[in-house]
């Protein structure tokens, strides 16, 4: 056993790190009150030069990463000295095997020295690493290969403060198995640190998304971890998301950031720096609620996709994959406003300079007043009565233009149009709705659209 192990940089190094006067990007403070080795056979270690440890325990330890200013000078290190899991130099040993490394009640922090603030903090970090060992390379004395084929990792019930201090990230369990090529995340939560989301909105300069996210389970299968580590290439067969509950709020009373141009999914993929290939992403049994708060309306505009399922295929930034001409596809099924079934299909060509994507969809029958939570705050239209028979739509869009067609069949429509809000009077869609509701039915008496 080792007690009260402390590793920390001196004040002179911290001062230089903060000012960017060192070639290092960060420093480490490490405090380990309890460090314990179990199952170590000293006799075998001495006679055979092999170390076998059944368990290593780190208890109540604190690891703090100190982030400084970007270094003014970058020192290029010799490639021969870089760490390589296939060739690790350790003189005087014939092998090391570790059954389990356990971290119990530990703390992890990232501290920004420049802005004097804590940007990442967890409360009770506990996890296990299992089944890995070092094997001496044949014909290369004192050089070893780190075997991770049977590595397992499990983390339980962690909470982190996300950089910026506006969100907390929690999860019930993270499990990773190298042999099975599986990463599972259970009970993931991303919640604002404010009980009232509008209090967070007051801190924002421009209108921006405020999230609440809960996910029952995420499972990532059949991925090449070695390729990720060695070459920075992310190849994944499938990502399965179950029980996603995504709430998004935007306070439209704040100004829009005209310098911010959100990218389309196909644009974002093609502009990724790291090569990514995901064969399939599936979302099941999920729920999306999107809200916008407008001036003059007590309740926010609310759009809901309930019982949401989606399938995404061929999400890639790999140039060789893009050059095949194959498109990324998204197929979505849900109940709009928790009532009528909605089906939407997207096609995102990746090998295209115009970045145009295509869509088509269908909304089934419903009572028109079921859409009031969306229509009244957003476009100033309140449906009194009427029956929607169906809506069919299709079109295409890119960052510059969009075009398409929509057919809406309805009967017995009666609605009120709010013309008090001058901004909404300028809305082209509002003008279309105002003209539409003059007609009580579509098709009309002569069965003409």
Where are these predicted regions, by residue range?
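Elongated, acidic membrane-bridging lipid-handling scaffolds
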Residues: 1-4, 42-44, 49, 53, ...
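Amphipathic hydrophobic-ligand
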Residues: 14-38, 50-53, 116-130, 161-173, ...
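Outer-membrane beta-barrel proteins
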Residues: 65-67, 197, 248-250, 415-417
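Transmembrane beta-strands of outer-membrane beta-barrel pores
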Residues: 6-9, 60-62, 107, 189-192, ...
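Short beta-strands and strand-coil junctions in structured, solvent-facing domains, enriched
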Residues: 42-47, 109-111, 225-230, 289-291, ...
């Amino acid at each position: 056993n080792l007690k009260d192990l402390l590793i920390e940089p001196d004040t002179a190094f911290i001062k230089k790190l903060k000012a960017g006067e060192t070639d290092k990007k960060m420093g480490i403070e490490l405090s380990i009150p309890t460090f314990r080795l179990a199952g170590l056979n000293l006799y075998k270690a001495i006679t055979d030069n092999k170390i076998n440890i059944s368990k290593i325990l780190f208890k109540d330890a604190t690891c703090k990463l100190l982030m400084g200013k970007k270094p003014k000078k970058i020192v290029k290190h010799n490639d021969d000295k870089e760490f390589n899991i296939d060739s690790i130099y350790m003189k005087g040993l014939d092998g090391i095997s570790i059954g389990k490394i356990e971290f119990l009640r530990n703390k992890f922090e990232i501290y920004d020295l420049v802005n004097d603030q804590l940007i990442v903090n967890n409360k009770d970090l506990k996890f296990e690493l299992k089944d890995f060992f070092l094997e001496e390379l044949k014909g290369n004395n004192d050089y070893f290969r780190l075997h991770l084929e049977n590595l397992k990792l499990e983390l339980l019930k962690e909470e982190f403060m996300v950089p910026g201090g506006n969100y907390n990230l929690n999860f019930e369990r993270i499990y990773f198995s190298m042999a099975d090529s599986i990463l599972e995340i259970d009970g993931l939560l991303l919640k604002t640190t404010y009980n009232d989301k509008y209090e967070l909105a007051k801190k924002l300069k421009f209108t921006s998304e405020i999230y609440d996210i809960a996910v029952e389970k995420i499972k990532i299968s059949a991925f090449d971890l070695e390729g990720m580590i060695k070459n920075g290439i992310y190849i994944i067969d499938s990502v399965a998301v179950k029980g996603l509950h995504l709430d998004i709020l935007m306070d439209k009373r704040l100004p829009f950031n005209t310098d911010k141009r959100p990218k389309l999914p196909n644009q974002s993929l093609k502009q990724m720096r790291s090569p990514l290939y995901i064969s399939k992403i599936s979302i099941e049994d999920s729920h999306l609620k999107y809200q916008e708060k407008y001036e003059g309306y007590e309740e926010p505009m609310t759009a809901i996709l309930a019982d949401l399922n989606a399938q995404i295929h061929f999400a890639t930034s790999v140039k060789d994959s893009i050059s095949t001409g194959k498109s990324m596809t998204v197929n979505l099924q849900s109940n709009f406003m928790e009532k009528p079934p909605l089906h939407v299909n997207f096609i995102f060509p990746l090998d295209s300079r115009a970045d145009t994507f295509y869509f088509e969809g269908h909304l089934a029958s419903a009572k028109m007043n079921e859409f009031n939570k969306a229509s009244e705050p957003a476009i100033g239209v309140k449906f009194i009565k009427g029956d929607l028979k169906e809506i069919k739509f299709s079109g295409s869009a890119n960052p510059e233009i969009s075009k398409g067609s929509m057919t809406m069949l309805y009967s017995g429509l009666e609605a009120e149009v709010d013309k008090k809000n001058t901004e909404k009077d300028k809305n082209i869609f509002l003008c279309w709705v105002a003209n539409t509701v003059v007609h009580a039915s579509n098709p009309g008496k002569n069965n003409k659209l």
